[in-house]
Structures are given as C-alpha cells and as structure tokens.
C-alpha cells in the first residue's frame, strides 16, 4: 500500500462528517416541502436510498429500503422482491456497514447528539444487546408483516409503524406542524413513537449510536456482509506494534487488530486516524 492511498484513507476518515452531511442532503433534497406540508411523490420515490430515511419525510428523495421491504412482504399479491433483496445484496457486498458510518442520515443524527457535552458511557459491557437488532429484523420486519394480515391478506409494516424513530422525526412531526388534518388524527401510536424517539435521543447523548448497535434492522442486514464486502479495513500486521490505540478509540466496541471485518464495524475510520504507524487503511477489492 503506497503512501498516497494511506493518505487518502486518513483524508476520507477526516472528512466523514462532511460526507454524512452531504449524504443526508442528497437523501432529503426536496427541502421546500417541509414548508408545504406535503411529501415528494416523483419517480425517484420508486428507488431505495442506502440509509434509514423515512419515505414520509417531506424532503425525502427516495424510499427507505426497510419500508419497501416490509411493503412487499405485507402485500396481498407479492411476498418477495428481487429488487429490494438485490439492493441489499449489491450494497452489502460493495460497501457493508460503511453505509452506516458515512451515508445514513439517522446515523449522522446520533453522531451529532453524542457530541453534546456531558458525561458519556461505554457500551462495552452491553455487547449482548447487539443481537437485539437481528431479532427485530426477523420478527418485526419479516415475520409479523408476513404472517399477521387483515381480511384481504395485507400486513402492516410493523417496524415502521411501531418502532422506527426516524419515521416520527422526519415524517409525522414535520407533516403535522403544517397540516391540521394530520394533527387531529394523532393519537396513542404517535405518543408511543415520540416516547421511542425521545428515548433514542437521550441514549444517543449518553452512549454512542445505541440505535445502530441495538435496534436498527438495516444495520443488521448490512452487517451480514461486512466480512465479504469489497470495501473493508485492512490492518498490516508487519507494521502493527500492538499498542491497542485502534481498539481504544473504536466506539463500536470492536477489537480492530483481531477483527477488522467485524459485523459491528461501521468503517468510520477512527482507528485509521488513531494508528501511530499508519498500519490501518481502507481497502477496496483487495487493493
């Protein structure tokens, strides 16, 4: 690995916040809709975006992949989508959880919350909770929409409806502010979703990315591809001095030297910036 490529890895990690901001803007480009109380419904809405971003957000450019996946599973006509499944596989094999670290709007939202000054807590002793997101994926995203249906065979998008805080943050709240009809229809479900959102906000201030670590089914899907994704993190054993700085700065609780392709790694690049010997870098297709 030549010095130019190592420098590029450090530069990429260094401007991660700007990349996250740009990705969030591109994912929600129709900003004037926030002031009109309506949702963009153009042709681009048939295309999924990489990160967790609610379809009902007034500014949303495309569809949320988790929402689209549930819509198909809960349909009375179709129970499988080659498009959405292929979308997951393509992005998973190409980028893995780099999407979580760089391209997801809700991931960036949590990063910003965690920057709020105050006492912070480690999640190292809470590692078993990381398996909760796989249970949520299986139960709320797949099984319930598939098996719990109404009289015409349609299932609800259970994760979006009962759990996802992004929906109330990006969709319900901004739409209700400018639409009296929506405000009058808000009830117990809205209150429940607001409670979840507030809980995630508070936890995000105290802990690093609790939603990503413990709840997000999209992160669970992408994590399955981390070991085989074309974009990954490489640790050069010949240069590593075993100082452990990479693992100390990893907020996803990954032992970087031993498991650089760990399912929890979001490719944020903190380890790349911390390494005193430039032994860690991004690698694409083995180069």
Please place each PLM-identified region on the residue numbering.
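Non-ligating segments of multi-cofactor redox enzymes
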Residues: 1-257, 263-287
């Amino acid at each position: 690995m030549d010095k130019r490529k190592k420098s590029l890895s450090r530069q990429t990690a260094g401007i991660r916040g700007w990349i996250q901001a740009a990705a969030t803007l591109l994912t929600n480009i129709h900003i004037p809709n926030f002031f009109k109380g309506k949702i963009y419904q153009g042709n681009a809405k048939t295309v999924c975006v990489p990160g967790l971003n609610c379809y009902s957000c007034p500014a949303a450019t495309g569809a949320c992949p988790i929402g689209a996946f549930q819509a198909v599973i809960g349909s009375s006509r179709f129970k499988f989508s080659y498009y959405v499944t292929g979308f997951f596989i393509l992005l998973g094999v190409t980028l893995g959880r780099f999407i979580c670290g760089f391209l997801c709007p809700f991931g960036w939202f949590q990063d910003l919350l965690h920057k709020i000054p105050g006492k912070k807590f480690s999640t190292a002793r809470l590692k078993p909770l990381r398996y909760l997101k796989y249970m949520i994926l299986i139960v709320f995203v797949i099984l319930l929409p598939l098996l719990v249906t109404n009289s015409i065979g349609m299932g609800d998008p259970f994760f979006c409806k009962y759990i996802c805080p992004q929906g109330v943050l990006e969709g319900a709240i901004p739409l209700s502010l400018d639409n009296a009809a929506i405000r009058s229809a808000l009830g117990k479900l809205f209150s429940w979703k607001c409670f979840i959102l507030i809980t995630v906000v508070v936890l995000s201030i105290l802990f690093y990315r609790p939603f990503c670590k413990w709840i997000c089914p999209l992160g669970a899907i992408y994590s399955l591809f981390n070991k085989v994704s074309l974009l990954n993190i490489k640790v050069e054993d010949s240069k590593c001095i075993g100082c452990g700085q990479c693992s100390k700065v990893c907020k996803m609780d990954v032992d970087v030297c031993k498991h650089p392709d760990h399912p929890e790694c979001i490719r944020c690049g903190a380890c790349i910036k911390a390494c005193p010997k430039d032994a860690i870098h991004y690698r694409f297709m083995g180069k």
